[in-house]
Swiss-Prot record:
Lineage summary: Bacteria, Bacillati, Mycoplasmatota, Mycoplasmoidales, Mycoplasmoidaceae
GO annotation, biological process: transmembrane transport
InterPro entries (alphabetical): Bact_Polyamine_Transport (IPR051789), MetI-like (IPR000515), MetI-like_sf (IPR035906)
Name of this protein: Spermidine/putrescine transport system permease protein PotC homolog
Chain's gene name: potC
Role according to the record: Required for the activity of the bacterial transport system of putrescine and spermidine.
Domain ABC transmembrane type-1: residue ranges: 72-263
One GO cellular component term: plasma membrane
Keyword Metal-binding: no
UniProt KW Hydrolase keyword: no
Length: 284
C-alpha cells in the first residue's frame, strides 16, 4: 500500500510537470485556429475554435499578409553565422582545455559559468559600451556585425559546456591506434574524433541557434536598424498579433516533428543493432 502510494505521488508529479511544460504550447496551437480581429490581433476565445466567425480572418492568412519575412530571414542569417563561428571556437577551446593544467582549467570554467549566470541586461550594457568605444568610434553603425558579435560572445560558453564533457570521455587509444595505422592528425580528426563528437556538436548547434534566434534583450540594444523576429514580436504594444501566434504554432509543430524523427531514428538504430546481434548469435 505504501509503495503504491509512493508510485502514485511520483506519477502525479511527473504528469503535473509534463502538463506545465506542454499545456502552454498546446494552447498556442489551439488559439492559432481562432480568427483575428480587424486590427490583426488574435481572438482569445476558445469557443471560436469550434465555431469560427466566418467574417474573421484566419491567423494563418494574416501570416501570409504580414511583412515578417525580412525579420525572419535576418534571424536565420544571424543564427546560422553565430553557429558557424561559435561551435568551431567551442570545439577548439575544448581540446585546448583538455591539455590545460587543472588550476587554469578551473579558472576558465569559472569565467564561463560566470558569463552564463550574468543577467542579459548586464551583458547587453557591457556590449553597448564596448561597441561605443570601438566599432562606433570608427563611424560605423550598429547592425548585423554588432548583433552577430554579441551573439557569438554569449553562445560560445553554451557550446563549450555541451562539447567538453564528450571530449573528456574520448579514448586516447583510438587516436594512438589511428596514428599507428598511418593516419595524419587531420585525417584522424575527420574520421575518428569528429564522428565521436557529432552528437554533442549537434546539440550545441541546436542550443546556439535557438538561443540566438529568440534573443531579445541583448539584440534590442545592439541591433541598430536591423529587425529580427524576437524584436518584432516584442514590439507589440496593443494585443497579440494573429500572425505571431500562427508563426509560433508552426515552430512548435516543426519542433515536435523533429523530436519524433530523432526518436524514431534512435529506435530504428537500436532495433538494427539487436537484429545484427541475433544474426551473429545464430551464425555462431
Amino acid at each position: 500500500m505504501k509503495k503504491h502510494f509512493k508510485n502514485l505521488i511520483k506519477n502525479s508529479y511527473f504528469f503535473l510537470l509534463i502538463t506545465l511544460i506542454y499545456l502552454p504550447l498546446l494552447i498556442v496551437v489551439l488559439v492559432s485556429l481562432n480568427g483575428s480581429s480587424s486590427r490583426g490581433n488574435i481572438v482569445l476565445d476558445f469557443g471560436n475554435v469550434l465555431n469560427p466567425n466566418p467574417d474573421s480572418k484566419s491567423a494563418y492568412l494574416r501570416l501570409g499578409e504580414t511583412d515578417f519575412a525580412t525579420p525572419l530571414i535576418n534571424s536565420i542569417i544571424i543564427g546560422v553565422i553565430t553557429v558557424l563561428v561559435s561551435v568551431p571556437i567551442a570545439v577548439i577551446s575544448a581540446f585546448a582545455l583538455l591539455r590545460t593544467r587543472n588550476a587554469l582549467k578551473k579558472t576558465i570554467f569559472g569565467i564561463t559559468n560566470f558569463s552564463l549566470a550574468t543577467p542579459d541586461i548586464i551583458t547587453a550594457i557591457s556590449l553597448v559600451l564596448l561597441f561605443a568605444n570601438t566599432w562606433l568610434s570608427f563611424n560605423q553603425q550598429l547592425g548585423f556585425f554588432t548583433i552577430i558579435t554579441s551573439h557569438i560572445s554569449f553562445s560560445v560558453p553554451y557550446a563549450l559546456i555541451l562539447i567538453y564533457p564528450k571530449i573528456q570521455k574520448l579514448n586516447p587509444n583510438l587516436i594512438l591506434a589511428s596514428q599507428d595505422l598511418g593516419y595524419s592528425p587531420l585525417k584522424t580528426f575527420f574520421h575518428i574524433t569528429l564522428p565521436y563528437l557529432m552528437p554533442s556538436i549537434f546539440s550545441a548547434v541546436l542550443v546556439v541557434f535557438a538561443t540566438s534566434f529568440d534573443d531579445y534583450v541583448i539584440t534590442s540594444l545592439v541591433q541598430g536598424s536591423v529587425k529580427t523576429i524576437a524584436t518584432e514580436l516584442y514590439s507589440f504594444r496593443k494585443g497579440i498579433k494573429a500572425w505571431a501566434i500562427a508563426f509560433g504554432s508552426i515552430l512548435i509543430l516543426i519542433s515536435v516533428l523533429g523530436v519524433c524523427l530523432i526518436t524514431l531514428q534512435k529506435y530504428l538504430r537500436e532495433k538494427r543493432k539487436e537484429i545484427i546481434k541475433i544474426r551473429q548469435w545464430k551464425n555462431s
